[in-house]
């Protein structure tokens, strides 16, 4: 198996070498919990990649939202291009969980829109764990939710080998058991087709399809092919085909599960009738019997995940199988932005249980549905042997449990923590306007954070009236639009962005030289020590970074935040002086923030949003895919979407005609 190998134009600098050394030694000495306290812009991701390469173990990195996970995934792929870096987040573009509101007697059915691209990446992630050890999976909190049993999933793998004798009807039956669908017309993900002696399969985890050619019952040839153009690409001697879904169950297990569900239904009906809940009993009987009939006839039903305990043969109350169970025992866990991610992981179990309990109490689900759930925090910790928590502001859990805290305070660029000024609230808007104008004159950018939506809107409107190019960033803005707005800030379309709690972790905005915090003395979640340090960090990527807090008194949180920033700044100044370093501003390609996230974020559902490929054959393939999407959109009367796709096709065709690089790429 290959080892991890870092590929980068840069060597470890600043605090990075000692951080990598200490964390790696800590892992080697068996430390279970360590924290990397790394300031904004210190290269924490590069440090993480180097630690992974040093210890050479499969690694799970958890991030608290899809956008940051996408950013981290992209960076890890750049640092570890020869290794398997995968992406595992929720595959729902839209998700409305099943629920019941007793006060209104209102039942809400589950409704979801699955993103096929994200589902493909999830399957690629689990497949990688079965085939190699040099694997890094960047995941959201989705990784603690139920997945099929690893050993059951592995038992369904179909190995194919050139020269192997295998009856075709057995292969077809096996593919159906693996949840592949036969479709001779629509050849897409998770489907197969048979034409004479040729079987074609589109695996659930691959861009390319497979063609298996038979001579009688002998496999004569296995070849990969482009599913759009039909072009044959490369011969393959042997390959494993993995199931099309993570939840796969044998016929024997399905029969056992149905018996278990029927027995549980009988017991639960007796309970409800004894309590005088006749309506609930009738409802549960009707719904469960319908599901059982569907499972007997079709092998699945809507909401089949609610019977996962029976299907997996688990005991009542036992933890579900999750992505963590697909990893080998010695895997390493890294929790990015742990002050946000750990509370999120901790809170998932209770929230899910409260919703499910109502469904069970009112006869919509059997009690076993409670076991279709995320891991509790204790169950999560029990599956992790060694963890590294990464944050600029570690939370209480990290501080209490870490056996070693490694600080990474010095930036490779020599940049210092921002200068902090506290000003009174009297006349704050006029003062802020003057400060903003100073930055605008120097072509620098400003972030302003307020406590309320109303205040943000009013301030943004006022700044626009004063001739300042301003945008208000609010919670209703979706992920992609938010990225566009931040990109426009960098490009100078806007000079100022006003927001509430949207300007914190993981934003790379080197042009921002001023962060203004209004109502800084209003103690609370948005003005806690952690929140203030994170917000101040947005100005730490600029040589002249400054933070202005408008307040009439200095709260405990403000003082602690200022003391911590001052401590870090002194360490940075001493390091720069000792090594004769002059702080350098960060120069970052503006397209990165947008293109990088566009390419993998789950919020983007259509190929018309994908960045243009570089190779000619990839562009041709994308054009064919887009034309298919365009016709489908027009057929569904989605004319605006069809027009958008058409415009993208025109752009790509023009690029093919005018770009000499693409014209000659194939011949290089």
Curated annotation (Swiss-Prot):
InterPro entries (UniProt xref): Helicase/UvrB_N (IPR006935), Helicase_ATP-bd (IPR014001), Helicase_C-like (IPR001650), P-loop_NTPase (IPR027417), UVR_dom (IPR001943), UVR_dom_sf (IPR036876), UvrB (IPR004807), UvrB_inter (IPR041471)
Annotated GO MF terms: ATP binding; ATP hydrolysis activity; DNA binding; excinuclease ABC activity
Extent of motif Beta-hairpin: 91-114
SMART domains membership: DEXDc, HELICc
Note on domains (UniProt): The beta-hairpin motif is involved in DNA binding.
Subunit structure: Forms a heterotetramer with UvrA during the search for lesions. Interacts with UvrC in an incision complex.
Descriptive protein name: UvrABC system protein B
The organism of origin for this protein: Dehalococcoides mccartyi (strain ATCC BAA-2266 / KCTC 15142 / 195)
Lineage of producing organism: Bacteria, Bacillati, Chloroflexota, Dehalococcoidia, Dehalococcoidales
Gene: uvrB
């Amino acid at each position: 198996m290959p080892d991890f190998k870092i590929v980068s134009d840069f060597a470890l600098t600043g605090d990075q070498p000692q951080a990598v050394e200490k964390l790696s030694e800590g892992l080697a000495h068996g430390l279970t919990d360590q924290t990397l306290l790394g300031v904004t812009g210190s290269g924490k991701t590069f440090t993480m990649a180097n630690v992974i390469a040093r210890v050479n173990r499969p690694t799970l990195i958890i991030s608290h939202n899809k956008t940051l996970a996408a950013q981290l995934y992209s960076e890890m792929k750049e640092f570890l291009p020869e290794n398997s870096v995968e992406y595992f987040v929720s595959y729902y573009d839209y998700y409305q969980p099943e629920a019941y509101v007793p006060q209104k007697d209102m039942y809400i059915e589950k409704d979801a829109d699955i993103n096929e691209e994200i589902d493909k990446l999830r399957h690629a992630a689990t497949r990688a764990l079965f085939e190699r050890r040099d694997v890094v999976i960047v995941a959201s909190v989705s990784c603690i939710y139920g997945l099929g049993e690893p050993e059951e999933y592995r038992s369904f793998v179909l190995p194919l080998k050139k020269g192997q004798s295998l009856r075709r009807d057995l292969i077809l039956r096996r593919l159906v058991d693996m949840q592949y669908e036969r479709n001779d017309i629509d050849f897409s993900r998770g489907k197969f087709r048979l034409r004479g002696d040729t079987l074609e399969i589109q695996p659930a985890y691959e861009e390319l399809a497979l063609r298996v050619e038979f001579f009688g019952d002998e496999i004569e040839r296995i070849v990969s092919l482009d599913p759009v153009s039909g072009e044959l690409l490369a011969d393959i001697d042997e390959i494993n085909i993995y199931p099309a879904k993570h939840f796969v169950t044998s016929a024997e297990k399905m029969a056992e599960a149905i018996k278990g569900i029927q027995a549980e239904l009988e017991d639960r009906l007796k309970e409800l009738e004894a309590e005088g809940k006749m309506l609930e009993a009738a409802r549960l009987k009707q719904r469960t019997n319908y599901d059982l009939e569907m499972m007997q006839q079709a092998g699945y039903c809507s909401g089949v995940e609610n019977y996962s305990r029976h299907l997996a043969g688990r005991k009542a109350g036992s933890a579900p199988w999750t992505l963590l169970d697909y990893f080998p025992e010695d895997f390493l866990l890294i929790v990015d932005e742990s002050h946000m991610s750990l509370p999120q992981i901790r809170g998932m179990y209770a929230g899910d249980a409260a919703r499910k309990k109502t469904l069970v109490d009112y006869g919509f689900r059997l009690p076993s549905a409670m076991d279709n759930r995320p891991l509790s925090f204790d169950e999560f910790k029990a599956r992790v042997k060694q963890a590294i928590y990464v944050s600029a502001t570690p939370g209480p859990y990290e501080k209490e449990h870490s056996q070693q805290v490694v600080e990474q305070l010095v930036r490779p660029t020599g940049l210092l923590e921002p200068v902090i000024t506290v000003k009174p609230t009297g006349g704050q808007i006029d003062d802020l306007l003057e400060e903003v104008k100073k930055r605008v004159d120097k072509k620098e950018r400003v972030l302003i954070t307020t406590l309320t939506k109303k205040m943000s809107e009013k301030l943004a409107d006022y700044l626009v009236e004063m001739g300042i190019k301003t945008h208000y960033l609010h919670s209703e803005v979706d992920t992609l639009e938010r990225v566009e707005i931040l990109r426009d800030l960098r490009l100078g379309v806007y000079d100022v962005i006003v927001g509430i709690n949207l300007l914190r972790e993981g934003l790379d905005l080197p042009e921002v030289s001023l962060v203004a915090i209004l109502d800084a003395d209003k103690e609370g979640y948005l003005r806690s020590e952690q929140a203030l340090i994170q917000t101040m960090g947005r100005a730490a990527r600029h040589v002249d970074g400054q933070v202005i807090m408008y307040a009439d008194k200095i709260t405990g949180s403000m003082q602690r935040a200022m003391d911590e920033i001052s401590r870090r700044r002194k360490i940075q100044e001493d390091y720069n002086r000792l090594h004769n370093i002059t702080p350098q501003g960060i120069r970052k390609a503006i397209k990165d923030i947008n293109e990088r996230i566009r390419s993998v974020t789950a919020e983007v559902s259509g190929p018309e949003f994908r960045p243009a490929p570089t190779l000619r054959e990839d562009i041709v393939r994308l054009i064919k895919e887009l034309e298919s999407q365009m016709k489908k959109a027009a057929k569904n009367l989605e004319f605006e979407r069809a027009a958008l796709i058409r415009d993208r096709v025109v752009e790509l065709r023009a690029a093919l005609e005018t770009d000499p690089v693409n014209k000659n790429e194939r011949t290089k």
